[in-house]
Swiss-Prot record:
GO terms for biological process: iron-sulfur cluster assembly; sulfur compound metabolic process. Keywords: Cytoplasm. This is Cysteine desulfuration protein SufE. The active site is at C51 (cysteine persulfide intermediate). One of its GO terms (cellular component) is cytoplasm. Belongs to the SufE family. The lineage of its organism: Bacteria, Pseudomonadati, Pseudomonadota, Gammaproteobacteria, Enterobacterales. Participates in cysteine desulfuration mediated by SufS. Cysteine desulfuration mobilizes sulfur from L-cysteine to yield L-alanine and constitutes an essential step in sulfur metabolism for biosynthesis of a variety of sulfur-containing biomolecules. Functions as a sulfur acceptor for SufS, by mediating the direct transfer of the sulfur atom from the S-sulfanylcysteine of SufS, an intermediate product of cysteine desulfuration process.
């Protein structure tokens, strides 16, 4: 997840955007920072159900129990949303991820109010899947 801002910086950058067009562009730019997944990682086991777009998230325990996350999507805005979620969860252990609620951060960014219902549902599906995978790893 190199290149993603820390939570507080993400929020500051998001709130500096003058309008929602700028915020969408920032989200897409964050998605471009994610390393692409190998074809071998695009398996049903890593696919997130409940997203209209195709979404894959790979989670592995790293150094000191910190969970390493990698993800991709076939849609630019969704890939950006993956990056936003990863930025909020970065440097956390599996138990930290299970205990951490990202939704207040989305509210501070007014994110869910400006997403289509299907994207909001997909975002919730991503969060549920990440927390479930983290619970399995803890």
């Amino acid at each position: 997840m190199a290149g993603l801002p820390e939570k507080e910086k993400l929020l500051r950058n998001f709130n500096r955007c003058a309008n929602w067009e700028e915020k969408y562009l920032y989200i897409i730019e964050l998605g471009q920072r994610l390393a692409p997944l190998d074809d071998a990682e695009r398996t049903p086991a890593h696919r997130i159900q409940g997203c209209q777009s195709q979404v894959w998230i790979v989670m592995n325990p790293g150094e000191n129990g910190v969970i390493e996350m990698r993800g991709d999507s076939d849609a630019a805005i969704v890939k950006g949303l993956i990056a936003v979620v990863f930025a909020l969860y970065q440097q956390m252990t599996a138990q930290d991820i299970v205990n951490f609620d990202v939704r207040p951060w989305f509210e501070e960014m007014s994110l869910t109010q400006h997403l289509t219902p299907s994207r909001s549902q997909g975002l919730e599906a991503m969060i549920r899947a990440i927390r479930a995978k983290a619970a399995d790893l803890s």
